[in-house]
Structure formats: C-alpha cells, structure tokens
Amino acid sequence: MKGMILAAGKGTRIKPISYAIPKPMVPILGKPVMESMIQLFAKHGIDKIVINTSHLAEIIENYFGDGHHFNVQLSYSYEATEVNGKFVSQALGSAGGMRKVQDFSGFFDETFVVVCGDAWIDLDLKKAVEHHKSHGGLATIITREVPSSEVSKYGVVVTDKYEQVVSFQEKPLESEALSNKINTGIYIFEPAIFDFIPKDVEFDIGSDLFPLLVERKAHFYAVNMDFQWLDVGKVKDVWEVTSDILNGKVKGYPIPGTQLAPGVWVGINTQIDISKCKITPPVIISSGCEVQDGATIIGPAVVGANCKVDAKSLVSNTLICDYIHLANDAYIVNKTMFGDYLLGHDGYTQLLADCLYVHILKNRNVSRPLMGRSSINDIYSTLAPKANPVPLQQVK
C-alpha cells in the first residue's frame, strides 16, 4: 500500500526550533516525531512512501535515506522554485504537494493514506482504511473526539447521520461548536481526488480541498476513531508531550535506556551513581552523560545525550538538548534547551550563549541534526542583540 507524509512546512509556529530543523524532525525522547509515523506505516503494510519536503529538506533526506532501515521504500518530492540558477524552497500546500507527485509519476494509483509529519499516533491504519472502503467514498478524514472544553484549540468536523462531512469550524468557541470531533491530519483518498486539485498552484487540503468537496457534495466522509494523538505543532507542545510520556499519560511510547530505579532511566556509557545524586522521578538521563555526585535532577526531566551535569547544579521540569555542560550553580527550572536556545515554558526565549553556567560543547565531531547545534549559526547572530551574560538564576 502507498502513503504520503507531509513535511514541507516552514514550522512557523515552532520557531526558533525550526530555524535549525524542520518540524517533523523535532525529537521526542531522542527520536524524530516523523520516524514514529514511518514505523507506523510499516507496521500496517504501507511500505511505499513519498515525503514532500521544502524547508531544510536535506536534514530529512539525510536522516531517513531510502527507508531500508525502516523496511519501507522512501522517495522525496522537493518543493522549490528556481531563481537565478538556484533552487529556493517554496511549498505548494499539502494538496498541491500531492498533485506535484501525481503529475510527476502517477504514484497514487490505488487507495492511499496521507498524514502530517509532526504528530505521533497509535492509530490502527488498516482498520481506518477498511472504514474508508466500506463507505465507497472518494475521501475520508479520521477524526477524534475531544472534551467540549477543548474544541476551541482545533479544527472541528461536522457530519450528518451517515458520517458524510457537511461543514468545518476552525477553532470555534465551545458555545458555538457543532461537534466535538476534530481533524487529526490523517486522510485516506482515492486517485480520483486529483480531479479536484488544480495543477501548479498552492492548494491546501484543509482550507481549499475539503471545502471544495463539501461544496460539490462529493463522497467525503469522516470516521471517528479512538486512538492516542500527540501533536508537536508548537514550541510548548514539545515539552508537554515529553512530560506526558514521562508521567505515564501516554501508553506504548518506548522510553529509552535502562530503568535503574522506579521512574529513572539511564542510557548506556553514562557515568552516574544515582545513590549519590538527588533524583526525583520521572527522569531520563541519556547515553554518554556524566552526572557528578550531588547533582539535583527533579522530574519530569530529560538530560540529552553526551551532557555533563556538575555537582552543584539543579535541573527541574526541564528538557535539555544533547552536548550541554551544566556547570556548578546552574539552576534550570521549567525550561526547554534546544539547539542554541533556552526556551521557557511560559514563552520566554534566550540564547544559550548569553547564559552563565551553561556551556555548549562546541568541539564535538558529530552529525546529529536532532538536538545539538545546527550548521546555521550565521542565522542565530541576527536573531537577538548581544547582551551581557545573565545568570540562570535570574532567567524568568
């Protein structure tokens, strides 16, 4: 079976993380969120997959390659325009990206599944496809029920008694919502869908294609299913998803490392004596770390790979990226460290280079685009004025 993963967006809502990596490469416990989606496809027999790319496309292509490590075949559709002999990234919209693939090779010659690359799900895709085929429809959107108090966060799908889609509401007020079923970004199509998608123009599935299907009264259905869905569309989602996994709110997500004590996981080649540290679970200390005696780590917390945590430092309710040295007197609470940034859970952003007691290990010779520094430091220099270093104790 065939599928497509949408990965061409600029990741505007997840800046500054997306300055360094595309949104589908955001790591959850060290693994890109899109890797889990590819593994789910493989599990359910979807082994021929096209990924559309644009923003920082090379990071995605270099990581996943041809897909053989995941027992699938991967191909990439790069969306760009040529300017003065050079390609400049230019996404075509989710439906436009589908049309580009179809015009190029006729790839979609059977029922196919399309998903967004920035979410983790445990949906039974085989069952979803069976529901789609039972309706005999042209398109099916997979929905999920949320509490009425949460509908204002999502796109709401309204159906008739036959499950045919009749309208959409974009983030309605609770009092105005006509349904509590939300769009999860999981779609099933027949090849005839391309009769509704124009060629060589930007065209979006949600805002362009679906309203057109409703207007023309096409056979367009919604199937409501019960499954876990973790979206990392915004900066705060990265920490919230990580925290939920550590706190046991997510079933089935693999936690890396060996559990040395209840709620304390430690990776290989790590130097730590948990009896001599002050550790309050749940905590993950990744591979290759050095945690000195006396260090305090209060969960939920994740220490990335190859980090050093000195004896008099404290970490609480925090996600730390790879290759970070927390010197004595570092006091990091309610933060996410990512690339060159210290991101507060309240939206505060600061360059790590401007923080005392935090050192980025610059002399590493690795090629990991996930959680360490990127190769685009020239961009960072334009993002914030130079300032005197601020002790982390003073960071809000």
Q: Model segments located where?
A:
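Catalytic-core segments of class I nucleotidyltransferases/pyrophosphorylases
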Residues: 111-113, 120, 126-133, 146-149, ...
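N-terminal nucleotide-binding beta1-loop-alpha1 segment
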Residues: 1-20, 42
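A short, conserved acidic/glycine-rich loop-to-beta-strand motif
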Residues: 135-145
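Conserved N-terminal catalytic core of the sugar/cofactor nucleotidyltransferase
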Residues: 2-5, 29-116, 125-127, 159, ...
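Structural signal for interior beta-strand "rungs" in well-ordered beta-sheet cores
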Residues: 258-390
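Conserved beta-strand termini and adjacent loop/short-helix elements that scaffold enzyme active sites
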Residues: 77-79, 142, 223-225
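Active-site metal-binding loops of divalent metal-dependent hydrolases
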Residues: 10, 117-119
